[in-house]
A protein has these predicted regions:
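A short beta-loop-alpha structural element at the N-terminal edge
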Residues: 49-55, 59
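Short, well-structured hydrophobic secondary-structure segments
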Residues: 86, 91-96
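Conserved beta-strand-loop-beta-strand hairpin that lines the nucleotide-binding pocket
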Residues: 1-51, 95-169
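Conserved short strand/loop->alpha-helix "switch" segment adjacent to the catalytic nucleotide/phosphoryl-transfer site
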Residues: 57, 61-88
Length: 169
């Protein structure tokens, strides 16, 4: 594997069968890593209606402010960066590829943040990029799958919801 390739250490469907080790994202995957599943229950903390990727710097700043000021305990800086990265990747994917109205919501459980983004592309499940050089981008969904303790997607009321659960501590 090239040294700059990103490797997922989760089971994945590969051409030729199931791999317990993971996959090499330069093009060997034959199936999605985002299961169709409902998220766990969580209380709403923040919500945004988004229309353009130019809004994402403000959204990231609001999330950082909330997590450092309003959260009941100090958050590890690395976990905070991972939370912000997940929201940014999921929202930018929805804005670029999803169409229709896009919403982003961050919810809280006692030990995690639930990031949930919706768009109107109900027939387009989250599909990590395959068959391309990692330097061309498209690794956001792989990265979020690795950072999260759970992740999935579902369709409800004419919208697709993509979600990831990220630890708070």
């Amino acid at each position: 594997m090239p040294p700059d390739a990103y490797e997922i250490v989760r089971p994945a469907i590969l051409l030729g069968g199931l791999s317990a080790r993971g996959l090499h994202v330069t093009g060997q995957t034959a199936g999605p890593i985002w299961p169709s599943a409902s998220p766990p229950e969580a209380a709403i903390a923040l919500h945004w209606e988004l229309g353009d990727v130019a809004e994402l710097p403000r959204v990231r700043a609001e999330l950082r402010r909330h997590a450092t000021r309003d959260d009941p305990g100090p958050m590890d800086p690395d976990l905070l960066d991972q939370l912000i990265l997940a929201l940014d990747e999921m929202a930018s994917n929805a804005l670029r590829h999803g169409g229709g109205s896009v919403t982003a919501t961050v919810r809280q459980t006692p030990d995690a943040y639930l990031v949930e983004v919706s768009d109107a592309a109900i027939h387009a499940p989250p599909s990590p990029a395959v068959g391309r050089d990692p330097s061309e981008g498209g690794l956001g969904l792989y990265l979020i799958a690795e950072l999260s303790t759970q992740h999935g997607w579902y369709v409800s009321n004419g919208h697709k919801f993509v979600w990831a659960l990220l630890p708070r501590a």
